[in-house]
């Protein structure tokens, strides 16, 4: 489902050409620390993570362990103090913020605990907006939006506003919106935490189906069993590093 980078930035082209890894996401020797009174608190400590296309990695950990920090680093929303993040073969540590933003828009998508849908747009219009942002035009945008909604079993809810959808349906629209971006990497932060067990199982299953069907490298921060059922790997963030469970 991933598409080649639209940017012609020479740095992006050079780092893509020089990459030899098959992983869609590589976080290498990432270190992040914060001031903690007179001390320094190390949140990520030479952390390593590699996720292959179509692989689902579930990450858990205690509150304050650094899970959100890891997701912002992997999602190019903040720079690590040290280390490298490579997305779809593109090394990003030496890039400007403009270049990193271009890589993020081309290759990354996010699903959060709350879908944060625009209240005035119907389900299909939420997805069409993504297509328009990606410079897609014409009837093909609506056709792809409808097909993507169908992939999360929302064909009959396409013309409903968020206020007319259940919590589980809104979260499925959020997943469809992420898929509309044709990402190489999908980052999901507690995507089922606000749902009852039945709806959580449905949403987790749809995420897993999308990851494997479209070969999307997927990171899920979660603690519930709904997400763990579909994990290829379950890692725990502890002491600034990821450890297998």
Residue ranges and their predicted role:
Residues 41, 92-109:
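ABC ATPase NBD coupling module
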Residues 83-91:
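Conserved ABC transporter NBD signature motif
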Residues 121-130:
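Short coil-to-helix segment of the ABC ATPase nucleotide-binding domain corresponding to the Q-loop/switch region
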Residues 182:
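Conserved catalytic motifs of ABC-family nucleotide-binding domains
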